[in-house]
């Protein structure tokens, strides 16, 4: 059984619809795929409907934007009930992203050709607006050749156009995911190629709050970082997952390039206590 537990659709910063993510996952030979868009569940229903048509199981999830002392942390939440404080926090994050995008485009527009309407045109229906959509508008306007160049030269956290956005504290996020009956797993915890990462002490605080897993197998981890994640998971009896972090054409990540072992997946599903079950398409 091949299992990919981290993908994005055009409901956040992916380029592919939820239904097409599911169809492509099936075509890639996956048996299980999780849809984990940033701070939104708006692709869940479409993904569930698609699963029943192509013979693949779908795990409904979210990737929650967190921040600890200025360091970005991503928390994957699997099978949480779509209500309550967790979802209030996600809506707050979504609204903050919109405000941030508007302000960044205003700053960029003083130097390069771009409007907020052009950014919206790059986003999917009900999408969580983010920097990738700004990058896509810059590409469409011929300012840069691709997303990577846009981030490197114009949209980085240290760049002159950067504006921050609200992100929940990771310990509180873990607590809210557990309260919603979900399974919290820290995404790519040691991927310093993406920017600064927290040390083990912060992860241990998250574990004390109820963190249940680490995404060890990810393209942004070095072999040493994979080993470190696995060792930490073993010490604390955490789940170990592997995933593609697929974004469609937005990133080079390919569906199924990293996967989760079946025993870890079965344990993850068993740990969920909400009524949000796996959508059985097989």
Predicted segments with their positions:
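An N-terminally biased module of ancient metal coordination in phosphate/nucleic-acid-related enzymes
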Residues: 1-71, 155-156, 168, 174-175, ...
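Extended substrate/RNA-proximal surfaces in nucleic-acid metabolism proteins
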Residues: 50-207, 259, 263-282
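Short clusters of hydrophobic/aromatic residues that line enzyme substrate/ligand-binding pockets
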Residues: 255
């Amino acid at each position: 059984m091949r299992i990919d537990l981290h993908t994005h659709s055009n409901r956040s910063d992916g380029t592919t619809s939820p239904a097409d993510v599911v169809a492509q996952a099936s075509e890639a030979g996956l048996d299980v795929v999780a849809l984990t868009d940033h701070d939104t569940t708006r692709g869940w229903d479409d993904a569930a409907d698609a699963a029943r048509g192509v013979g693949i199981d779908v795990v409904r999830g979210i990737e929650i934007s967190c921040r600890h002392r200025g360091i970005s942390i991503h928390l994957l939440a699997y099978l949480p009930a779509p209500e309550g404080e967790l979802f209030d926090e996600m809506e707050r994050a979504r609204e903050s992203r919109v405000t941030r995008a508007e302000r960044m485009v205003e700053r960029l527009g003083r130097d390069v050709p771009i409007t907020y309407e052009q950014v919206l045109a790059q986003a999917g229906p009900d999408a969580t607006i983010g920097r990738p959509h700004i990058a896509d508008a810059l590409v469409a306007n011929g300012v840069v050749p691709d997303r990577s160049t846009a981030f490197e030269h114009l949209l980085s956290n240290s760049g002159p156009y950067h504006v921050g956005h609200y992100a929940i504290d990771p310990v509180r996020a873990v607590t809210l995911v557990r309260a919603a009956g979900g399974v919290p797993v820290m995404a790519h915890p040691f991927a310093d190629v993406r920017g600064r990462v927290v040390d083990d002490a912060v992860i241990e605080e998250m574990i004390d709050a109820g963190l249940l897993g680490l995404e060890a197998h990810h393209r942004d981890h070095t072999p040493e970082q994979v080993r470190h994640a696995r060792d930490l998971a073993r010490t604390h009896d955490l789940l170990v997952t592997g995933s593609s972090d697929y974004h469609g054409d937005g990133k080079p990540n390919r569906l199924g390039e990293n996967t989760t072992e079946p025993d870890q997946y079965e344990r993850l599903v068993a740990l969920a206590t909400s009524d949000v079950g796996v959508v059985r398409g097989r």
